[in-house]
Amino acid sequence: MKQTMLAILVAGLVTGAAQAAVTVKDDAGQAVTVDKPALRVVSMAPHVTELLFAAGGGSRVVGAVNYSDYPEAAKRIPRIGSNREIDIERVIALKPDLIVAWMHNSSERQIDLVRKLGVPVFQSDPQTLDSIPESVLRLGRLMGTEAAAEATATQLRKQLAGLRAQYAKRPPVRTFYQVWDKPLYTLSGKSILTDAMRLCGGVNIFDSLNVVAPIVTIESVLQANPEAIIATAEKNYGGVELWKQYGSVQAVRNKNLFTLDGNLLNRAGPRMIEGTAAMCEVLEQARKHRAAR
């Protein structure tokens, strides 16, 4: 009888542990397992911080990299360095039970360092707009905040569906997206930004380049002759002013030089869908300018 009761007790403990453990696949295709909901999370990228808040885990983020400035509460999170150079001693002192890294912009050395802490590491790198709500759901599972994550994911998917319905059949607009001016670099078809552009009916003039964020020349942009040029408005980013001297470019002739908020387009977090809507609006302006000529 005692042996039977002991067996039942052990079975119950094993079942409980199995139910508590959660495993998801990260964007590197690796399994990430937490034995219980993560309560102390470290974010190694600004877009990751936004994803964690969107998943209902903002109060659980105990450390974040510089420029993690959204939502407002994120500004008060202790800093651990930059996405390329973290202070590993600060990370250790925070005693995290989950670390979320940026798959391509956090260096391999940094990821190896945090792995050696024995803490589960989720590598984040959303490649499409659809993967943003999916990322929210997976992070919500790891933190045990599924209800909040599901609500956010549902809303994001609804917004995406609305944009697709609105712009699915719009005429294409050949577009140059300028990330920085010195050096002049852009984003290729391998980036999530191009997925957003396609949703709007935009065609990235550097879609076929193999590098995600290639440096390009002014001459190559002039030769491609884009119908629209989009740059970002951050303090240290180059604007569209440099193109005004090139009157032969279609974007200049048609007054299709646009400036958007880079935080909404260069971070693969929930707000990127808002940024996509803004991009769609300016590309629609370009179509109207085309019709008016």
Predicted ranges, named:
Residues 65, 190-213, 233, 258-259:
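His/Asp/Glu-enriched short active-site or ligand-binding loop at hydrolase and phosphoryl-transfer sites
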Residues 88-95, 117, 215-225:
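Short helices/loops that flank or line small-molecule/ion binding pockets
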Residues 39-94, 98-104, 205:
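A short, structured surface patch at a secondary-structure boundary
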Residues 45, 103-104, 179, 209, ...:
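Short secondary-structure boundary segments
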Residues 19-39:
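N-terminal hydrophobic or amphipathic helices and topogenic motifs
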Residues 5-16:
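Bacterial N-terminal signal peptides
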Residues 25-29, 80-89, 105, 209-218:
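Short helix-initiation/N-cap motifs at beta->coil->alpha
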Residues 24, 30-31, 97-98, 102, ...:
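Extracytoplasmic substrate-binding proteins
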